[in-house]
From Swiss-Prot:
In thylakoid membranes, TATC and TATB form a large receptor complex, containing about eight TATC-TATB pairs, which binds the precursor protein. Twin arginine signal peptide promotes pH-triggered docking of TATA oligomers to TATC-TATB receptor complex, inducing a conformational switch of TATA that results in activation of the translocase. TATA dissociates from TATC-TATB upon completion of translocation. Residues 51-136, 214-223, 292-302, 352-353 are stromal. Residues 63-86 are annotated as: Disordered. GO terms for cellular component: chloroplast thylakoid membrane; TAT protein transport complex. PROSITE patterns: TATC. This is Sec-independent protein translocase protein TATC, chloroplastic. Keywords: Chloroplast, Membrane, Plastid, Protein transport, Thylakoid, Transit peptide, Translocation, Transmembrane, Transmembrane helix, Transport. The gene is TATC. It comes from Pisum sativum (Garden pea). Pfam families: TatC.
C-alpha cells in the first residue's frame, strides 16, 4: 500500500499519554483496501492495532530531535573557523612576545649571539670539536705532568717549607709505615705541580671557548680570568700564613701537658694541602657573583639584602671546607668569605647590575 502504517501493542498507549477513547481504531481489509472503524469490544480478538495518531506523534518527535541536532552541528561548524583563527592569533601573539622577551634578555643574548658579534666564528663538525678538545687536554696533561716532575725533584725542599708553620712548636713528624714518606712526597709534588700547571690548563680552556665568545664577552673574560687567578693564589697564601698556623697551634696548645705531639707525616700534609686548596677555591666567591650579575640573574641590591643568610652560609661553608673541627679555623675562614661576598655584591652594584 502507499500509506505507511505502524502496528503497536495496545499496552504502550499510556506511555504516550493516550487512551483508548482518543483513538479511532481502524481495521484494514487486505483484499479490498477498504478500512472501517471497529469498536473496542470487537477489537479484542485482534492482537494489534493500526494507530495513525501514535505513528504521527513518534515521527514528529524524531523530526524535532533531528532538526535540533542539525542546528547544533551547523553552529559548531560555523564557529570552528572563528575559534581556530582566534587560537592561532593568540599562539602567534604569545610566540612573538616570547621572542621579544628573549631578545631583550641577557641570557638569550648570551646563548644566541648574532654572527656580527662573533669575529672568529666558523663552522666545525662535532668530530672537529672533539679533535681540538683532545689536543688541548693532551697539552694540559703534558704541562701538569712536567710541573709534577719538576716539583718531585725538589720534593724535600717543599716538605721543609710546609713543615715550617709548626716547627717552632716542637712538633716532630714520624714515618709510621714503610715508604710513607716516599708516597707523601709524591702527594706533595702532585699538589704543587697542579698548582704550578693550573695556568696552562686555564689557557687551554680559554683558547677552546674563545671562538664562541662575542667581543663584549671577550672584554669581560680578561678581568674574570685575572681576578680568579689572583684570588685563588691569594686564598692559598692566606691559608698558609693564617689558617694553617692558627689551626695547628690550637691543636698543639690543646694537647700541651697531656701528650707529646708526634704527628704522622702523611696525615699532616693531607691536612695542610686540603686546607690550602679548599681556601683557594672558596676565594672564588666574587667571581661567581660577577658572572651572575653579568647574566642578569641576581642584582647587587638582592645580594646585599640577604646578608643575614650569607653569614650563616659562610659559617657552614667554613665548617665543611676546613678539615679540622676547631672553631677558630672556621671563624678565620668564615670572616674573609663574608668580606669577599660583600665586596663582590658592591662590585656588582657599582657595575650597574
Amino acid at each position: 500500500m502507499g500509506l505507511g502504517t505502524t502496528t503497536v501493542p495496545t499496552n504502550i498507549l499510556p506511555q504516550f499519554g493516550l487512551h483508548r477513547t482518543h483513538l479511532n481504531p481502524i481495521r484494514v481489509n487486505n483484499s479490498t483496501g477498504f478500512s472501517y472503524p471497529l469498536s473496542l469490544r470487537k477489537n479484542k480478538s485482534f492482537d494489534r492495532l493500526v494507530c495513525f495518531a501514535v505513528d504521527d506523534e513518534i515521527r514528529e518527535k524524531q523530526q524535532q530531535q533531528l532538526s535540533t541536532s542539525s542546528t547544533r552541528l551547523g553552529s559548531a561548524v560555523e564557529e570552528r573557523p572563528e575559534n581556530k583563527d582566534m587560537i592561532d592569533g593568540i599562539s602567534e601573539e604569545a610566540l612573538e612576545n616570547f621572542k621579544e622577551d628573549g631578545e631583550r634578555s641577557a641570557i638569550y643574548d648570551f646563548l644566541y649571539p648574532s654572527k656580527e658579534l662573533l669575529p672568529d666564528d666558523k663552522e666545525m663538525s662535532i668530530f672537529d670539536h672533539l679533535e681540538e678538545l683532545r689536543e688541548r687536554i693532551f697539552i694540559s696533561v703534558l704541562g701538569v705532568g712536567g710541573s709534577i716532575l719538576g716539583c718531585f725533584a725538589f720534593s724535600k725542599d717543599l716538605v721543609k717549607i710546609l713543615e715550617a708553620p709548626v716547627k717552632s712548636e716542637g712538633v716532630r713528624f714520624l714515618q709510621l709505615a714503610p715508604g710513607e714518606f716516599f708516597f707523601t712526597t709524591l702527594k706533595v709534588s702532585g699538589y704543587c705541580g697542579l698548582l704550578l700547571g693550573s695556568p696552562i690548563i686555564l689557557y687551554e680552556i680559554i683558547a677552546f671557548i674563545i671562538p664562541g665568545l662575542t667581543k663584549e664577552e671577550r672584554k669581560f673574560l680578561g678581568p674574570i680570568v685575572l681576578g680568579s687567578s689572583v684570588l685563588f693564589y691569594a686564598g692559598i697564601t692566606f691559608s698558609y700564613l693564617v689558617l694553617v698556623p692558627a689551626a695547628l697551634n690550637f691543636f698543639v696548645n690543646y694537647a700541651e701537658g697531656a701528650v707529646e705531639s708526634l704527628w704522622s707525616i702523611d696525615q699532616y700534609f693531607e691536612f695542610v694541602l686540603v686546607l690550602m686548596f679548599s681556601t683557594g677555591l672558596s676565594f672564588q666567591v666574587p667571581i661567581i657573583q660577577l658572572l651572575l650579575g653579568q647574566l642578569g640573574l641576581v642584582s647587587g641590591d638582592k645580594m646585599l639584602s640577604v646578608w643575614r643568610y650569607v653569614v650563616v652560609g659562610a659559617v657552614v661553608a667554613a665548617a665543611v671546607v676546613t678539615p679540622s673541627t676547631d672553631p677558630l679555623t672556621q671563624v678565620l675562614l668564615a670572616a674573609p668569605l663574608l668580606g669577599l661576598y660583600l665586596g663582590g655584591a658592591w662590585m656588582v652594584k657599582l657595575a650597574g647590575r
